[in-house]
Structure formats: C-alpha cells, structure tokens
Amino acid sequence: MTSFFNYHEYISSNDRAQTHHPNIYVEYGQSDTKLRRCVRVPRDYSVVGDEYPYFSTHFVGEEPGAYPSEEGPTYDSRSPLKDIISYQEYNDIVGTINGYMKRAFSPWQKCQFIETVLSFLTLWIFERLFASNNERVLAQLDEYIDQLNSKNADRFILINPRKNGFLSLDFLVMVGEPNI
C-alpha cells in the first residue's frame, strides 16, 4: 500500500488517502507527536497565482479532487478537522488569513507602492526608520493567530504560516492514538 500526501493527485487502487500528517512542529518522540495530527490546508494557486499566498477555501478532504471511499474509512479523504470545526468557522479563519496575506504581500496594494517609491527616493533609509506595511500586517496576523489559539486550544492549534514558509495553513488537531 502506498501513502500519498497529495492524495488528490493520485487515484489508484489500494492507496491510502492521507488528509492529516504527523506533528512536525514538536521534536520526534514527544507525546504530542502521537496525540496531535497536522491537517494541512494547501495554497490555492488558481485564484491569484503566486502573487501572494492564498490558502484553499475548500474544506480539507472535500476538495474537487477528493474522493469518497466505497471501501471504508481507510481509503477515504475524510479529514479529522471536520469533527472539530464547522464549515463557517473554517471559512472565517481561512478568509481572514487570506485577507492578511493580501494586505501584506500583494504588490498592487497602495501602501506597498508608496513605501517602495519612498524607499527608492531615500536610498532605502525609509525602510530602516519605519516598519513596513508587510511587518505591520504580519504582526497583526501573529496577534490574530495567538488569540485564535488561546480561545480554541482544547480543539485545535493553528500554526503560524511563517513557520512553514507560507506553503500551507496547518491545524494541529487531537486525534488520540492514530491508526497508521
């Protein structure tokens, strides 16, 4: 049996769909590696390309490429996140984070353009004297994630996208002893 992390790219018999992964954010062997699983929300390049990080708004395991199993839960795209968070809450979280990503990284924001011009005209002294829009928005994102985690620590922990280079949005969920 083969286990694919990008399960929606491969569909063949006797392959296991994997919508959650071991907790890579703690040292191997700690008890948290077995109790929490990492559910990854991938970036969606079909919306804005690579202009700025944009995370998929499809609920994990229910993307257009996900497949339901007729052979039982082992081969199903079902995610453990579905038991923990509602669709509305998921869309609110991902939508809010996507908003921060746009404000921080989109080159077409007025603030980005003005800061670039001022930096150029002052020979980049402006960047040394003042915090950039990017830094301010990412600080707001950090605060949002900290508030979200303190409010929902018993259900899930949202990992700051900075920790994985903005490649995915990672939720750590309690699953007990995973049967993998």
UniProtKB/Swiss-Prot annotation:
One of its GO terms (cellular component) is endoplasmic reticulum membrane. It is a peripheral membrane protein. Its main location: endoplasmic reticulum. GO terms for biological process: protein targeting to membrane. It is found in: Endoplasmic reticulum membrane. Interacts with ERF2. Belongs to the ERF4 family. This is Ras modification protein ERF4. It comes from Yarrowia lipolytica (strain CLIB 122 / E 150) (Yeast).
